[in-house]
Curated annotation (Swiss-Prot):
Disulfide bonds join 30-66, 31-58, 39-56, 43-52. This is Alpha-2-purothionin. The gene is THI1.2. It is found in: Secreted. The lineage of its organism: Eukaryota, Viridiplantae, Streptophyta, Embryophyta, Tracheophyta. PANTHER family: ALPHA-2-PUROTHIONIN, THIONIN-2.1-RELATED. Belongs to the plant thionin (TC 1.C.44) family. 4 C-C subfamily. The keyword Signal applies. Residues 73-136 form a propeptide. One of its GO terms (molecular function) is toxin activity. Residues 1-27 form the signal peptide.
Length: 136
């Protein structure tokens, strides 16, 4: 992967961080800041709750509200999670995948980016995200 592809992957990861900030999923973790929430969500794609909460300075809670000083709670159980996932996919594809398509050098590379980026958005929004390369 050339520097153009690496730059695209870096931008993709940054935009996914923004998506994480906007799309909340049901959970029982509370974080002090949005950065902590993003850290926790990204960590949870591979790590355990307790480890991620410690590393990202978040707290695990069994209730629907967060302790004082930890305002960043994921959506409560009455949320419309399917709508959230649908909007996550739409936002991910329109921002991240559009950027990747515009960065493609030719039609073949563009098709590869569209296919892999769409799959990555589905996995990301459904909570199955892993850090993988787009040139698989």
């Amino acid at each position: 992967m050339g520097s153009k592809g690496l730059k695209g992957v870096m931008v993709c990861l940054l935009i996914l961080g923004l998506v994480l900030e906007q799309v909340q999923v049901e959970g029982k973790s509370c974080c002090r800041t949005t950065l902590g929430r993003n850290c926790y969500n990204l960590c949870r794609s591979r790590g355990a709750q307790k480890l991620c909460s410690t590393v990202c300075r978040c707290k695990l809670t069994s209730g629907l509200s967060c302790p004082k000083g930890f305002p960043k709670l994921a959506l409560e159980s009455n949320s419309d999670e399917p709508d959230t996932i649908e909007y996550c996919n739409l936002g991910c594809r329109s921002s991240v995948c559009d950027y990747m398509v515009n960065a493609a050098a030719d039609d073949e590379e563009m098709k590869l980016y569209v296919e892999n980026c769409g799959d990555a958005c589905v996995n990301f929004c459904n909570g199955d995200a892993g850090l993988t390369s787009l040139d698989a």
